[in-house]
Amino acid sequence: MAGAKEIRSKISSINKTRKITRAMEMVAASKMRKTQERMRASKPYANKIYEVIKHIARAASEYRHPFMSEREIKRIGIIVVTTDRGLCGGLNSNLFRETIRTIRNWQEHGKEVDIAVIGRKGQAFFRRVGGNILGSIDHLGDTPSINDFIGVVKIMLDAYYNGTIDSLHIVYNEFINTMTQKPFVKQLLPLPKSEEDKKTLGHHWDYIYEPEAKELLDEILERYIELQVYQAVVENIACEQAAKMIAMKSATDNAGDLIKEFQLAYNKARQAAITQELAEIVGGAAAL
């Protein structure tokens, strides 16, 4: 058994680590709440843009924007949203598993895949496993803006415009609740249609557009896709902070359990030392 002095040193070291993980847990909780607020703030704006797109598309029914036109899919683009840092449990590894599963499924059906990566962890992963990377960006921080990653988005939109890819998807972690985050693959292009959209397009709005509806649609559709990517990035950050908070709480709890174990070992070592000293005193007295 280790000596009492050595055990006390270990207890002190673990206690310092526990203070650090506790502080990191609190910071992650604070960042998660702020990111959730940004998530909520962007949704009404995105919903309203989508409504406007549907109205304008109805007004310019003779014009089929490439983003809204189905085509034969031979090559698929995917934007993979990951974190820059670790210490967030299995968040990235779960996302990578889902991404690889999705890519392999497409490849089994004869589709080629082009990839754009957001986040250092994704860059490192695809350098290791390989893949046709069209663009990447990292170091977005905890409060990114659309301008921070607009270059990567533009690369993929240009690839869609010129026919290099025929479909565009994004994969990111979906925030279910503080304890649960799961990988989610979402189609961006061509713009998916729902039954509700078909009902909406069946109505007529008599609006006058300035500039023309076609010009508005060209501009707004790009902004909408950029906003979809922004929402995915922000939601992924919320997932990162939630996972980090849980991981740090687990580390703090484990440190507490270790301290209890070492404290018990320290008490036993101290008791053994005292017993030894008493035995030596008694033995010395008996010798006299």
Swiss-Prot record:
Any one annotated GO CC term: proton-transporting ATP synthase complex
Biological processes, Gene Ontology terms: proton motive force-driven plasma membrane ATP synthesis
Domain of life of the source: Bacteria
UniProt key word Cell membrane: yes
GO molecular function, one term: ATP binding
CDD domains cross-referenced by the UniProt entry: F1-ATPase_gamma
Membrane topology term: Peripheral membrane protein
Record key words, sorted: ATP synthesis, Cell inner membrane, Cell membrane, CF(1), Hydrogen ion transport, Ion transport, Membrane, Transport
Localization per Swiss-Prot or TrEMBL: Cell inner membrane
InterPro entries: ATP_synth_F1_ATPase_gsu, ATP_synth_F1_gsu, ATP_synth_F1_gsu_CS
Family according to the record: Belongs to the ATPase gamma chain family.
Subunit structure: F-type ATPases have 2 components, CF(1) - the catalytic core - and CF(0) - the membrane proton channel. CF(1) has five subunits: alpha(3), beta(3), gamma(1), delta(1), epsilon(1). CF(0) has three main subunits: a, b and c.
Function per UniProt: Produces ATP from ADP in the presence of a proton gradient across the membrane. The gamma chain is believed to be important in regulating ATPase activity and the flow of protons through the CF(0) complex.
The protein's name: ATP synthase gamma chain
Gene it is expressed from: atpG
